[in-house]
């Protein structure tokens, strides 16, 4: 009988119809489990390309890795960028480590808009050393991880604070060399410093110099410039950013408000009907003494305002209209109410025409019709 799985959703990757499963959101701790399995699948022939692929799978392009611990000469804190992360993991194995994995206990997760933060106060980094003697090192501390909130769930920030470490030697090795004081003296010495090998510590010290030079190395690789030219270019661009004036806030362009044609036509009609009524009025306004090209009898219409290569805004246009024309307001359409009040269909005793005059000018306009009656 064939050993084909009975899962209806199973599709062999070697078959003609390979189906990739829909990506799903996994738990952050499971990503650490996948990273441990990937580190265990490492071989002695793993080159830089393998480590670059490892870092690309589990770390973001702008990821940072930070290690904090305390040595004999004081506390240390090293932060490296995404470019130097693959080399960090490779130096761990170059220092005699044969196996590396992380154990997270009682971790706390917090979800944000674009990231997931994992805070594990009881994290253990376990390394197996094959030389000079078989030793198991347990490095305990606090691990804070920030994952991206997407299907890839790659690490954006890695911060491991080392508190203590222990080096464990099997009893069988002690029993074998119980009669050899030189071997026992060698086994009593630590092979790591705060759980890190000398290879890793030297690399972290080197990263203090390499991390600021990432821009120079990237420019050298991109433009094929000499190191001196790369340094000059970077310094010049940094100087430009320092002396450049702050960017001015963008101003919104002024919009030009045009007159409504229907209001203008109704105003001209109403002014033509009221010519005889206002002929006997002795009122004289400043607007009547001005002359404009677009002028109708007894009504002053303001044209489009311009000013030496620029245009007035809405606020200026309203101000000019208010100064030059006291009988006509194009913005609010006050002439419609004047047409309604002066309609011949309304008598003097009509309840719709009982609005008292507001100013002395209105009384003077209504005086001639009352005299004619």
From Swiss-Prot:
Expressed in multiple tissues including heart, brain, liver, kidney, testis, lung and muscle, with expression highest in the brain, trigeminal ganglia, and lung. Ubiquitinated by RLIM/RNF12, leading to its degradation by the proteasome. GO terms for biological process: epithelial structure maintenance; hair follicle development; positive regulation of cellular component biogenesis; positive regulation of transcription by RNA polymerase II; regulation of cell migration; regulation of kinase activity; somatic stem cell population maintenance. It is found in: Nucleus. Residues 298-337 form the LIM interaction domain (LID) domain. GO terms for cellular component: cell leading edge; nucleolus; nucleoplasm; nucleus; plasma membrane; transcription regulator complex. Residues 341-373 have a biased composition (Polar residues). One of its GO terms (molecular function) is enzyme binding. Residues 263-280 have a biased composition (Low complexity). Signal peptide: none annotated. It comes from the Eukaryota. Residues 244-287, 327-373 are annotated as: Disordered. Keywords: Nucleus, Ubl conjugation. InterPro entries: LID, LIM-bd/SEUSS. Pfam families: LID, LIM_bind. The keyword Nucleus applies. Interacts with LHX9. Interacts with SLK; leading to negatively regulate SLK kinase activity. Interacts with LMO4. Belongs to the LDB family. Transcription cofactor. Binds to the LIM domain of a wide variety of LIM domain-containing transcription factors. This is LIM domain-binding protein 2. It comes from Mus musculus.
